[in-house]
């Protein structure tokens, strides 16, 4: 059975690739959160433990209407509807019949999946932000393997969609 299409979904500070600080986004962009929801509803989402914990802290529960797969060696028994896996490979094997999966962070998970990604949905936030989590260097990978299929500028940020070249 073919593996699902892997889409990386991230909001990144344009100048220094910051994606987080103290387990939180360093910005609040309502339009980006709405886009995140619209893209991911009904699809599995893959994340690291810290990203999962920050979502639960913010929402009081895991993401609704999505199958949450968390990369961790720790038990998530308090969240029986959330699946935990020790590796990306085991998580992907568990969803082999799915059409696509969205990788939603954090830093380590982005690093480990960037090379295998089939697409990227990025929000590039203008400015230089203080942070402790960073998106991996991606410009060369995009240049060599992806085509920009959508670029939508907004006030202070832009959405960019990249698809893998055939």
Give, region by region, the residue ranges found by the protein language model.
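Enzymes that bind and transform nitrogen-containing heteroaromatic metabolites
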Residues: 2-166
């Amino acid at each position: 059975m073919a593996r699902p299409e892997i889409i990386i979904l991230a909001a990144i500070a344009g100048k220094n690739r910051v994606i987080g600080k103290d387990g939180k986004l360093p910005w609040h962009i309502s339009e980006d959160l709405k886009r995140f929801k619209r893209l991911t509803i009904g699809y599995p989402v893959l994340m690291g433990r810290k990203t999962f914990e920050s979502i639960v802290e913010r929402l009081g529960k895991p993401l609704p209407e999505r199958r949450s797969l968390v990369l961790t060696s720790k038990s998530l028994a308090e969240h029986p509807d959330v699946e935990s896996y020790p590796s990306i490979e085991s998580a992907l094997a568990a969803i082999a019949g799915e059409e696509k999966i969205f990788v939603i962070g954090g830093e380590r998970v982005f690093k480990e999946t960037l090379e295998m990604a089939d697409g990227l949905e990025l929000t590039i936030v203008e400015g230089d932000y203080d942070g402790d989590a960073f998106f991996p260097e991606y410009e060369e990978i995009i240049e060599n393997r992806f085509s920009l299929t959508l670029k939508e500028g907004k006030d202070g940020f832009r959405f960019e969609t990249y698809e893998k070249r055939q």
